[in-house]
Amino acid sequence: MTPSISWGLLLLAGLCCMVPSFLAEDVQETDTSQKDQSPASHEIATNLGDFAISLYRELVHQSNTSNIFFSPVSIATAFAMLSLGSKGDTHTQILEGLQFNLTQTSEADIHKSFQHLLQTLNRPDSELQLSTGNGLFVNNDLKLVEKFLEEAKNHYQAEVFSVNFAESEEAKKVINDFVEKGTQGKIVEAVKELDQDTVFALANYILFKGKWKKPFDPENTEEAEFHVDKSTTVKVPMMMLSGMLDVHHCSILSSWVLLMDYAGNASAVFLLPEDGKMQHLEQTLNKELISKILLNRRRRLVQIHIPRLSISGDYNLKTLMSPLGITRIFNNGADLSGITEENAPLKLSKAVHKAVLTIDETGTEAAAATVFEAVPMSMPPILRFDHPFLFIIFEEHTQSPIFVGKVVDPTHK
């Protein structure tokens, strides 16, 4: 007979993304032939693209008037790792909710894809800091299934910590210290409280630090207006950059598209909709269009103005993932029997995702560097990001969307 007690599991998907616009030496154009074309990379990029858009649309549905910022990679990695210990409908819901077609892709290939992605993200890069971490926090009297532990370590590079959840303050400190250290102090107090029945916690973080290949000069940053909506205007520090940039207008999306590279293996796509076309952009954008944007670069002389900003996201993944079909794991019908050898059933009592993004200029020494670029001697057209826009940050090798955001009001952190 199944015991009446139900143990709780905490899932924490945390992210820190710092994008300082330091001045850097100019570098050569990205060679698209060097992108990782392995089947594992293609598989994970395709599914993460679908998952990112589904998740974004659900966030818009829940709140269309606030900034959005999250990491599809962080959330998907945490749930995929959890699927290692799930069975039955719980297992199927997780993987299908992550947009995997289980009739076409084997479970082994799914986890190999995540393993390859995490290895790629954690690859040393002298110009770009991009690292991930997964922590398993286990009550000191709870015995985990050895197969789950081995696969979590092998595929997801998970670290295992023994904690006493009966001492909730100490348990919180262990988890928060792991996330704070991994995000270099940018995410603190990721866990504010623990349910009294929690016996197992899973935490994932991603840290990103990048420098623009074509940098902004802080001397050119000026206060300017940003139109939040038709009746609301705020003052923001607006960065400016002139030169040969990847900018074009996409008639399908009714939006201007700006593609900016980081020094290292990452790039950002900014999507600025025409007046009144934000909803059209959000409904039309898909992974096929994003792929075309990344492949079809169109350099032109242009002057761009974009806000210096810091935004964050703090989401309850239970309300966010349920509309995507991931429901069983959160209720008493959850089957996570592949995680623990204990008889008492385990369910996901809480799942949170925290994200932080900063785009800014830093330091006077950086401003002293010089970038040389030949440009035509004419006044460039001007593109102002002075009303709500979207952005996606990609890892170049796999073309996986690691961060997705919407800036509605740059003054709201």
UniProtKB/Swiss-Prot annotation:
The record marks 377-378 as: Reactive bond. The keyword Cell division does not apply. One of its GO terms (biological process) is response to peptide hormone. GO terms for cellular component: extracellular region; extracellular space. The keyword DNA-binding does not apply. It holds the Pfam family Serpin. Residues 368-387 are annotated as: RCL. Glycans are attached at residues 64, 101, 265. It is found in: Secreted. It comes from the Eukaryota. PROSITE patterns: SERPIN. Keywords: Acute phase, Glycoprotein, Protease inhibitor, Secreted, Serine protease inhibitor, Signal. Residues 1-24 form the signal peptide. GO terms for molecular function: serine-type endopeptidase inhibitor activity. Gene3D superfamilies: Alpha-1-antitrypsin, domain 1, Antithrombin, subunit I, domain 2, Serpins superfamily. CDD domains: serpinA1_A1AT (cd02056). Its main location: secreted. The reactive center loop (RCL) extends out from the body of the protein and directs binding to the target protease. The protease cleaves the serpin at the reactive site within the RCL, establishing a covalent linkage between the carboxyl group of the serpin reactive site and the serine hydroxyl of the protease. The resulting inactive serpin-protease complex is highly stable. Variability within the reactive center loop (RCL) sequences of Serpina1-related genes may determine target protease specificity. Belongs to the serpin family. Murine alpha-1-antitrypsin is represented by a cluster of up to 6 individual Serpina1-related genes. The precise complement of Serpina1-related genes present varies according to the strain of the animal. PANTHER family: ALPHA-1-ANTITRYPSIN, SERINE PROTEASE INHIBITOR, SERPIN. Inhibitor of serine proteases. Its primary target is elastase, but it also has a moderate affinity for plasmin and thrombin. This is Alpha-1-antitrypsin 1-2. The lineage of its organism: Eukaryota, Metazoa, Chordata, Craniata, Vertebrata.
